[in-house]
């Protein structure tokens, strides 16, 4: 584990292994570098693998209550400074939104981009369909639960939305409690993604190829975001991981890793 200084202040924790062209992995909004543990073990030799890890204890980039994707992109810039060259950036879920933002605002920092079901909710604001209604409903019910102090119910619905009914209840109790403690510390971060400056116009400005990965069992939200990406990116590659839902770095790591390696420039 290494701590790196982040431009503008603070630090970011990374886990790294190997040598060669740098490949940087960004985790989901409720996860950590552990989401990439199996991918690291399966990745062929010849790359410098770097996973950005989560903040703990309520800390995080930027100012609490006023965080933006720029703060999370700052973590990527810290890694680029650390490795001394442009990186292949792979972002999952929240990390995918950060990767898209970085590609639009700092293309010189990147050698390539891959996004795995990025939660770029701002792309759905102009879409008149069930996907935006679904994610707004999930957000609003989550906030109602949290205001009432019902964190279990808030994340039971959230986790089940992305993993299937009954998923959260099947977690071991100790894992659930540790997860909820961590999420209480992180707080309400919905607006970071809903208000992100990721639009059809910013996507069209991205000149580099972007590898868009989705699961065959993607939610209506992730499928709609993927459609917006493929419609607006100038140079998009598209892969579908058969049988996978949103949490494919954990559930379908082998096929996902093969897909990512195969499309890496």
State what each model feature region is:
Residues 7-62, 85:
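Conserved HGGG/HGGXW glycine-rich cap/lid loop of the alpha/beta-hydrolase fold
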Residues 24-28, 92, 214:
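The conserved beta1-alpha1 loop
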Residues 50-90, 94, 258:
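Active-site loop/oxyanion-hole signature of alpha/beta-hydrolase fold enzymes
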Residues 53-57, 119, 244:
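Short beta-to-alpha linker loops that shape the active-site pocket of alpha/beta-hydrolase fold enzymes
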Residues 86-126:
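Conserved hydrolase catalytic core segment
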Residues 122-174, 190:
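Helix-rich cap/lid subdomain of alpha/beta-hydrolase
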Residues 178-231, 240:
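Conserved serine/cysteine hydrolase catalytic core
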Residues 241-257:
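Catalytic histidine-centered segment of alpha/beta-hydrolase-like enzymes
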């Amino acid at each position: 584990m290494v701590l790196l200084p982040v431009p503008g202040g603070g630090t970011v924790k990374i886990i790294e292994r190997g040598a060669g062209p740098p490949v940087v992995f960004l985790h989901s909004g409720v996860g950590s570098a552990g989401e990439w543990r199996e991918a690291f073990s399966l990745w062929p030799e010849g790359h410098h693998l770097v996973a950005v890890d989560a903040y703990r204890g309520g800390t995080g980039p930027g100012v609490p209550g006023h965080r933006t994707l720029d703060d999370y992109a700052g973590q990527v810039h810290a890694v680029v400074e650390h490795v001394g060259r442009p990186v292949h950036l792979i972002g999952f879920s929240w990390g995918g939104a950060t990767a898209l933002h970085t590609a639009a605002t700092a293309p010189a920092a990147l050698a390539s981009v891959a996004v795995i079901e990025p939660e770029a909710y701002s792309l759905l604001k102009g879409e008149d369909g069930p996907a935006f209604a679904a994610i707004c409903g999930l957000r609003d019910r989550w906030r109602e639960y949290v205001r009432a102090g019902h964190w279990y119910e808030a994340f039971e619905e959230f986790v089940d939305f992305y993993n299937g009914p009954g998923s959260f209840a099947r977690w071991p109790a100790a894992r659930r409690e540790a997860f909820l403690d961590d999420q209480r510390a992180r707080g309400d971060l919905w607006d970071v993604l809903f208000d992100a400056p990721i639009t059809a116009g910013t996507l069209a400005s991205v000149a580099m190829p972007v590898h868009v990965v989705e699961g065959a069992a993607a939610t209506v939200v992730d499928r709609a975001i993927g459609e917006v990406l493929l419609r607006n990116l100038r140079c998009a590659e598209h892969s579908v991981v058969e049988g996978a839902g949103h949490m494919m770095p954990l559930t379908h790591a082998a096929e996902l890793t093969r897909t990512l390696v195969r499309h890496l420039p």
